[in-house]
Structure formats: C-alpha cells, structure tokens
Amino acid sequence: TAPKPIDTEANLGVMNAENVNIVVHGHDPSLSEMICEYADSKEMIDYAKSMGAKGITVSGVCCTSNEVAMRRGIPMAGNFLQQENVVLTGACEAIVVDVQCIFPALGPLSKCFHTKFITTSPICQMPDSDFIEFDAGTAGEKAKQIVKLACENFKNRKPELVHIPDLKHKATVGYSVEAIVKTLDGVTNSQVDETGTTKPLLECITSGVI
C-alpha cells in the first residue's frame, strides 16, 4: 500500500516489557512487511500469549523503520545509530536484519542478552547470528518462522537485564508524493484543471504565496 499520513511513536520507549519485541532493521521492505503481517495475526498473538507474553510489539530501526511506519504506523525504536541500543534494553526477543547498515557488533552483543540476531540474506550472513534465508517464494513461511522463534525466545528473557527508557515521542509520518497529491486534489478546480498533479503547490510557489 502507498504511504499515507498516519500517527506513530518513536524512540526506545516504544518497546513493551510485557510483550514479545521484534525489531526489523535494514532496507528490504518486503521482509519487514511480512514480519508485521504475521506478528499481527491472531495465531501468532495467541502463540505469544502461550509463551507468557501479553502480545507482540514490532518496531523498526533505520530505513526499514520508515517503510513500516508510514504504511502501518509501526513505531520507530531508533535510527541507524541506535541499533545496538534496542538490544541493550534486554527486552528484544529478535532483531531481524536484511542486506545493509548492520553493525557487526550486533552478533556478540546479542549473545550477552537473550536476543536472537537473525540474518536473512545470503550476501549478509554474519557471525553469531541465526540465518533464515528470506525470498519472495517462501516469504510467508519464513516470516512466520521468525515471528514464532521470537515468541519462543520470550521465556529466555532475563528480567534483571531489562531496562526500557521511559522516552518516546509522538509523530505523524507518511507524507508521500501520493498523499500530498491527493491532498492537493482537494483544492484543484476539476472544471479547468486535471487532478493528480502538484500544480496547485507549484502555482503557490511561483506566485510567491509560499
């Protein structure tokens, strides 16, 4: 689906101490979309509850975070520089990565906690990770496997190591070209102009109104 204006939250405080926390990180939106799809399914939520959690929280890091935020309102745990911090909360059951922007330290760092560091691309396998290859043909099957693995890892969490900062901020995201053009259609005179263009905005700029 195309991005649209939607409310979300950002910073490490979006992680939930009572839920299974899955963090998606990287640049492949097809992976993060499928993770979100299955994490939101009744089957997986019930499975998480059977493991002792109250539900499942998916949050994002880096560019993947922006993709799922502006399409689904998925909260943003942090930017590129905060990827290690989500593990340091002690509440991350799985951090799922794809092709780039991945700190090599995530592997050994995750071993200091209970976090599953899951790599999914053959070109980006890393030490101290669980490799689950993701491709379009088996996307649903592999996403479900990853979500299930995260749920099963909830029982391995060490409560004494959990520290989620009480810090998060509200945000409205999703101002894509499509969303902006749709808004501009509302001020377009369809009797004399075509809809679906940025002409109203351009006219405001060229006339000096903006």
Where are the regions that the model predicts?
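Metallocofactor- and cofactor-centric catalytic cores in central/energy metabolism, strongly enriched
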Residues: T1-I210
